């Protein structure tokens, strides 16, 4: 218990004693004293103690505070007037108290004030690859003969004897020997040392391990000069500090002329029984009083019942030390730590979740943050690989995409195609015969264009009658379509390279749809699909724009952009463009002898062009609306208009638990109530956030409400069954065939003469193969053997007859892969800029591929140098340096090397390039793999070279875990690099922002470096 706590208890005793006397009846007879303190009617400060007195009360500031009681302010024990609180290194003031901390490389002593050296070599060899040597306040790594210490000061580089002058032991360098481009050697010093005038020796400075001093250090021309706190004296070794009483005894014993003189002094001290003798028996602090000695303990310790001994307080036992997550007790203090995925805030108590989704390049598609972690998801048609990346799924590699005939893979999807003379079935998988030349002319209209005048202004409408699709691209961009393009147009190419969508002997002209594309502009409006208010959506007598043809497909793509007006002070305007594509079909049944097919087509084309002219005027005046399921939507919003009925979410979304979520599959967004409504029976919806449901292929209206895909529509044949149209009545797949999907018109043969045990099977696994293949293999129905999946494919299941292609441009290291995680991107990652950039191993943060080789070149602009930060690197040491990252001046093995490693290091390191340009190479062998690396860099003005090197070479930058986390925090590194690359950007960050971003010790370290750089002479 500290002295401040003792004073606190004394104040409590005084207050209780005063109250007891009043209860005992002291005072004037009959007088009733009012206890303002207990009634709370006093006006004492919150940091004061209320002491009741006869007829009044007193306010006494609590220990650690000063003032007259009604106003109390904290005493800053760390000020010079209080001798830094008795702390030999750093003093941190806290309300009503203070706390001592030590420089990196030291730990707090039992007295809570002194600082003792930490032997870093005891913990994982100090991170040194070979030899670790402890020193006062620091440590240093050394290498065995034939090795050089790399610039990260931990790893050792081995070089051959050829052309290496530094291999000569007589090179004369005290610390580091470097090869120069012109030949010969140049000496350098370890961090915290200055190169002497002879350019060979190294002079220790206070930047390295506090200059070897236990307390204070001051740089002089001859090296560090050590000093001690006022209660201590410098030991004869010139570095260590001892208490003055102890030092006085040592000096007096040294100067004693006789044993008798010493005996007299000892006897006198024993008789006096004061703190001068054996510190009064106190473990820590001793104070002489009228009744004898009184022992006390520093902050972080408590006095034991013997009144002499001090015991460390385990702060972690009381409310976990105030730490959010982990609490680690230390001698006289404690430290807080956080779980993985969290960071410690600058109050050194609170843990905050790291929002990885706020970082750049975290996920390719969708990022979902969660406490302590995050998850990457991919959009439909893509699959996850390498932890965060999304690659297109090649559905055609999985049993031909279940297509009956041809399969064409596309980005995020795929299409089944049919041979000439056949068309796609409604299930988009099977091919059926075309019903003559007029099959397309019988297609019903999917949309309708109409206009009507309101108040002299013509309003035009696009009414979606059938299938609609809404795809929001951003806050100011979306795509809306009605109908299905080219419903019967997907065909397989002929042998001569052409394709056909009609039956034999039919002309293409009557059945080919008319397609027209147009671009419209809306001034001073932003793309925002919004339900139109009921007051504005009045009944209007409308007339169709196209009465001689069917509109089978319309798509509207709306995107907005800012366009600056003329004049410097003119604000920019919002300009929106709508790109529309129309697909119409003639009403061939209206053909006559006076106007046959060609004539009808020409009239339809003229009608479509005339309709586009009318639409251009309507859209330009923002009088164009889209109608879906009875709800009218405005396609764009003018800034002056208030967004009515939007709530806080966009179209297709509703508010749930404070978040905007899209309407789920099986539902659609109804703009009138602004809610998600279930699909009615006979319709389905397999996508999120849509404005309508798609009619089921069956016209009978079967199926349950809320169908989430076409397979949930009623009346379809179940898996293992088929029919001519895919609807009931159905028959079972014959023996030797199977069908895994509903609503199909046929079954797939097992192949190779294989049979099934019974009819109605739904999987190839039901085929009686002669061998049951394990994952990583597929069954060959020709040879009846299990074949390993080739490189670039995988198979996670048993008994399959195919392998799945790796997503995107990824591949596998070997054949026989069993999981998509084995698929790796072979591309060497990174972005190389003049001021900032990064390099990363292929497939990062997933494991890099085997036999990879990457080369990067960093060439900064003139008069700029390169600073590199390696937050962490994962290279398996089991490979015996088969995977290597090297940075040097050029591709020549003899050029100046800046960094080289073949090991895993989770401790970050920062260093400057030894050459103006960098050639970087990463190579991996065929053995073990690892996560690899993502290494950022920044180029800075060479005038700051001395300052930057002084910072990155100071061991204090890496000793603290808080400092290490800074070099791993992508947001903080980005902020630091922003200022280093462009110093004027420093003024973007306020002092408060800096305090909230960085720990106090880190700011103090940088401030001292910058001050020394700007004012080198005192």
From Swiss-Prot:
SUPFAM superfamilies: EGF/Laminin, Growth factor receptor domain, Spermadhesin, CUB domain. Residues 33-73, 74-116, 117-153, 166-202, 206-241, 275-310, 312-352, 353-391, 392-428 form the EGF-like domain. Keywords: Calcium, Cell membrane, Disulfide bond, EGF-like domain, Glycoprotein, Membrane, Repeat, Secreted, Signal. Disulfide bonds join 37-50, 44-59, 61-72, 78-91, 87-100, 102-115, 121-132, 128-141, 316-327, 323-336, 338-351, 357-367, 363-376, 378-390, 396-407, 403-416, 828-854, 881-902. GO terms for molecular function: calcium ion binding; identical protein binding. Residues 828-940 form the CUB domain. It is found in: Secreted; Cell membrane. Residues 493-512 are annotated as: Disordered. GO terms for cellular component: cell surface; external side of plasma membrane; extracellular space. PROSITE patterns: ASX_HYDROXYL (PS00010), CUB (PS01180), EGF_2 (PS01186), EGF_3 (PS50026), EGF_CA (PS01187). Its main location: secreted. Glycans are attached at residues 255, 400, 496, 709, 780, 809, 819. Induction: Down-regulated by inflammatory cytokines. Residues 496-512 have a biased composition (Polar residues). Forms homooligomers and heterooligomers with SCUBE2 and SCUBE3. Could function as an adhesive molecule and its matrix bound and soluble fragments may play a critical role in vascular biology. This is Signal peptide, CUB and EGF-like domain-containing protein 1.
């Amino acid at each position: 218990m500290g002295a401040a706590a003792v004073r606190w208890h004394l104040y409590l005793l005084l207050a209780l004693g005063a109250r007891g006397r009043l209860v005992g009846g002291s005072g004037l007879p009959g007088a009733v004293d009012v206890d303002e303190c207990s009634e709370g009617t006093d006006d004492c400060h919150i940091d004061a103690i209320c002491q009741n007195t006869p007829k009044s009360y007193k306010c006494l500031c609590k220990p650690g505070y000063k003032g007259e009681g009604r106003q109390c302010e904290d005493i800053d024990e760390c000020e010079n007037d209080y001798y830094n609180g008795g702390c030999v290194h750093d003093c941190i003031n806290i309300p009503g108290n203070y706390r001592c901390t030590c420089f990196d490389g030291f730990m707090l002593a039992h007295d809570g004030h002194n600082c003792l050296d930490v032997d870093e070599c005891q913990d994982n060899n100090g991170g040194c690859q070979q030899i670790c040597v402890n020193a006062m306040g620091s440590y240093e790594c050394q290498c065995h003969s034939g090795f050089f210490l790399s610039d990260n000061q931990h790893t050792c580089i081995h070089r051959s004897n050829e052309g290496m002058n530094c291999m000569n032991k007589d090179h004369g360098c005290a610390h580091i020997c470097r090869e120069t481009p012109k030949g010969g050697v140049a000496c350098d010093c370890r961090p915290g040392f200055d190169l002497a005038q002879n350019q060979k020796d190294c002079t220790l400075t206070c930047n390295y391990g506090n200059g070897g001093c236990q307390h204070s250090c001051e740089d002089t021309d001859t090296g560090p000069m050590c000093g001690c706190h006022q209660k201590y004296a410098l030991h004869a070794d010139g570095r260590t500090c001892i208490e003055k009483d102890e030092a006085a005894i040592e000096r007096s014993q040294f100067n004693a002329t006789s044993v008798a003189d010493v005996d007299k002094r000892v006897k006198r001290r024993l008789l006096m029984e004061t703190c001068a003798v054996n510190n009064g028996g106190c473990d820590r602090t001793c104070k002489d009083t009228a009744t004898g000695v009184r022992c006390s303990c520093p902050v972080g310790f408590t006095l034991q019942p013997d009144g002499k001994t001090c015991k460390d307080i385990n702060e972690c036992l009381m409310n976990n030390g105030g730490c959010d997550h982990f609490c680690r007790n230390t001698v006289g203090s404690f430290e807080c730590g956080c779980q993985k995925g969290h960071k410690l805030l600058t109050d050194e108590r609170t843990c905050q979740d790291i929002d990885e989704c706020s970082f750049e390049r975290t996920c390719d598609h969708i990022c979902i943050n969660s406490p302590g972690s995050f998850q990457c998801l991919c959009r439909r048609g893509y699959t996850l690989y390498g932890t965060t990346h999304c690659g297109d799924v090649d559905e055609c590699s999985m049993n031909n995409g279940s297509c009956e005939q041809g399969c064409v893979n596309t980005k995020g999807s795929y299409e089944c195609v049919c041979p000439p003379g056949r068309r796609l079935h409604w299930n988009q998988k099977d091919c059926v015969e075309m019903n003559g030349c007029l099959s397309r002319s019988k297609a019903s209209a999917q949309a309708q264009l109409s206009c009507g005048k309101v108040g002299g202004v013509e309003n035009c409408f696009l009414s979606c009658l059938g299938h609609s699709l809404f795809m929001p691209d951003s806050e100011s961009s979306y795509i809306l379509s009605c109908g299905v393009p080219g419903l019967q147009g997907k065909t397989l190419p002929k042998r001569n390279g052409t394709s056909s969508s009609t039956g034999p002997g039919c002309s293409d002209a009557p059945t080919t749809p008319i397609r027209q594309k147009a671009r419209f502009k809306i001034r001073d409006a932003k793309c925002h699909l919004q339900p139109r208010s009921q007051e504005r959506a009045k009944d209007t007598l409308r007339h169709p724009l196209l009465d001689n043809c069917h509109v089978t497909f319309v798509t509207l793509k709306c995107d907005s952009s800012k366009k600056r007006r003329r004049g410097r002070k003119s604000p920019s305007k919002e300009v929106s463009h709508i790109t529309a594509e129309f697909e119409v079909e003639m009403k061939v049944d209206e053909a006559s002898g006076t106007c046959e097919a060609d004539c009808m087509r020409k009239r339809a084309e003229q009608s479509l062009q005339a309709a586009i002219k009318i639409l251009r005027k309507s859209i330009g005046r923002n009088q164009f609306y889209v109608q879906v399921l009875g709800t009218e939507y405005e396609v764009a919003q003018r800034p002056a208009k208030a967004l009515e009925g939007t709530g806080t979410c966009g179209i297709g979304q509703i508010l749930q638990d404070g978040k905007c979520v899209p309407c789920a599959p099986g539902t659609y967004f109804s703009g009138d109530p602004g809610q998600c409504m279930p699909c009615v029976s006979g319709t389905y919806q397999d996508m999120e956030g849509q404005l309508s449901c798609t009619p089921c292929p069956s016209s009978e209206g079967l199926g349950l409400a809320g169908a989430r895909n076409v397979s949930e529509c009623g009346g379809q044949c179940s898996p293992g069954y088929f029919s001519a149209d895919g609807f009931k009545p159905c028959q079972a797949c014959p023996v030797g065939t199977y069908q895994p999907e509903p609503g199909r018109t046929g079954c797939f043969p097992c192949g190779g003469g294989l049979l099934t045990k019974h009819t109605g099977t739904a999987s190839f696994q039901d085929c009686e193969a002669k061998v049951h293949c394990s994952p990583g293999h597929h069954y060959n129905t020709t040879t009846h053997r299990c074949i390993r999946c080739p490189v670039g494919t995988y198979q996670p299941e048993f008994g399959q007859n195919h392998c799945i292609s790796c997503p995107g441009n990824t591949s596998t290291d070997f054949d026989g892969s069993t999981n998509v995680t084995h698929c790796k991107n072979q591309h060497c990652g990174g972005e190389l800029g003049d001021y900032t950039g990064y390099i990363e191993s292929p497939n990062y943060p997933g494991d890099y591929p085997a036999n990879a080789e990457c080369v990067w070149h960093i060439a900064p602009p003139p008069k700029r140098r390169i600073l590199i930060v390696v937050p962490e690197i994962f290279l398996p040491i089991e490979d015996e340096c088969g995977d290597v990252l090297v940075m040097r001046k050029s591709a020549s093995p003899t050029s100046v090397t800046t960094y080289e490693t073949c090991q895993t290091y989770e401790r970050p390191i920062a260093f400057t390039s030894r050459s103006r340009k960098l050639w970087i190479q990463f190579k991996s062998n065929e053995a073990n793999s690892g996560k690899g690396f993502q290494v950022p860099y920044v180029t800075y003005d060479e005038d700051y070279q001395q300052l930057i090197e002084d910072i990155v070479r100071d061991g204090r930058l890496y000793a603290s875990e808080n400092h290490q986390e800074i070099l791993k925090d992508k947001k903080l590194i980005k902020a630091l690099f922003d200022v280093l690359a462009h110093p004027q950007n420093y003024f973007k960050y306020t002092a408060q922002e800096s305090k909230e971003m960085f720990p106090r010790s880190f700011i103090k370290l940088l401030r001292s470096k910058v001050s020394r750089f700007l004012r080198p002479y005192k």
